[in-house]
Amino acid sequence: MIEKIWSGESPLWRLLLPLSWLYGLVSGAIRLCYKLKLKRAWRAPIPVVVVGNLTAGGNGKTPVVVWLVEQLQQRGIRVGVVSRGYGGKAESYPLLLSADTTTAQAGDEPVLIYQRTGAPVAVSPVRSDAVKAILAQHPDVQIIVTDDGLQHYRLARDVEIVVIDGVRRFGNGWWLPAGPMRERAGRLKSVDAVIVNGGVPRSGEIPMHLLPGQAVNLRTGTRCDVAQLEHVVTIAGIGHPPRFFATLKMCGVQPEKCVPLADHQSLNHADVSALVSAGQTLVMTEKDAVKCRAFAEENWWYLPVDAQLSGDELAKLLAQLTSLASGH
């Protein structure tokens, strides 16, 4: 229902307009206060790059963060990552991730980024505290990438990157809750780069698509072509589950059942195993896998996806980030 409201297919969005006006007024006032320096943002001693969204819901932001960190690492740059840690609750903040950190403590996305990149990752509701925690333990870090936080103006940033869904784009264009917007589309004029996940990119936008890899068994780490798996049941606890289901079908899988879950939803063995009958195979996202690995069964698999970006604007962005980081 929410997708129909945000896309404009359902007229119910009109009933929510008063709340959207209030949301827009408050969010605009907050940004203006920082712009006029009525509120002061904390500036890190090294460059900060924000990778965020203008809309609620999954746009492929986390794969972009992983891709960006890996690209900078390949250029010899030491990168740190900070996040709010949605879906997690640590005993205290900031929390610097280690191999023992669970998704219950840090959230699924920070754990995934840490496992994929090996970069220092810290979470905190106050992102400046997360930056300080990284620099205290890793003073050689040259640049910080913040996963989400475009609207977290308390942390000053040097580069802003926005990821948008190239198919859904901005829906009906209204602020939450009548529409999907955290900020209006005009905000794109002030950011440094716009990455478009799928669809047809417009002039100046960086095209991106998600490339699926081989399926990975949660218990053994064995890899195989996902199309070889039979009697598949799939779950997806991401911002936009239909994208993952469509990816599986593109890979030649016809799931017997597709189960969308809430983004950042906590998972346990009883709930997940109840979704799979005898003889069926469970396939999930990598983001779900980091929550399920500790109690996974033999027939549980995940399908990793990697961001693939291209174009002249991408080369300019990487050159800009490399230059910024090299100065520190």
Swiss-Prot record:
Asked if the keyword Nucleus belongs to this entry, the reply reads no
Ordered alphabetically, the record's keywords are: ATP-binding, Kinase, Lipid A biosynthesis, Lipid biosynthesis, Lipid metabolism, Nucleotide-binding, Transferase
Gene Ontology terms: cellular component: plasma membrane
Q: Which reactions appear under catalytic activity for this entry?
A: a lipid A disaccharide + ATP = a lipid IVA + ADP + H(+)
Looking up Pfam families in the UniProt record yields: LpxK (PF02606)
Give the InterPro entries listed for this entry. Answer: LpxK, P-loop_NTPase
Top class in the EC scheme: transferase
EC number(s) reported in the record? 2.7.1.130
According to its UniProt record, in which pathway does this protein act?
A: Glycolipid biosynthesis; lipid IV(A) biosynthesis; lipid IV(A) from (3R)-3-hydroxytetradecanoyl-[acyl-carrier-protein] and UDP-N-acetyl-alpha-D-glucosamine: step 6/6
Can you supply a Gene Ontology BP term from the record? lipopolysaccharide core region biosynthetic process
> Which positions in this protein are listed as binding ATP?
55-62
- Going by the entry's taxonomy, the superkingdom of the source organism is recorded as Bacteria
Q: Which residues form a coiled coil?
A: none
Q: Which GO terms describe its molecular function?
A: ATP binding; tetraacyldisaccharide 4'-kinase activity
Q: Of which family is this protein a member?
A: Belongs to the LpxK family.
Role summary = Transfers the gamma-phosphate of ATP to the 4'-position of a tetraacyldisaccharide 1-phosphate intermediate (termed DS-1-P) to form tetraacyldisaccharide 1,4'-bis-phosphate (lipid IVA).
Q: Which NCBIfam families does the record associate with it?
A: lpxK (TIGR00682)
Q: What is this protein called?
A: Tetraacyldisaccharide 4'-kinase
- Source organism of this protein record: Escherichia coli O81 (strain ED1a)
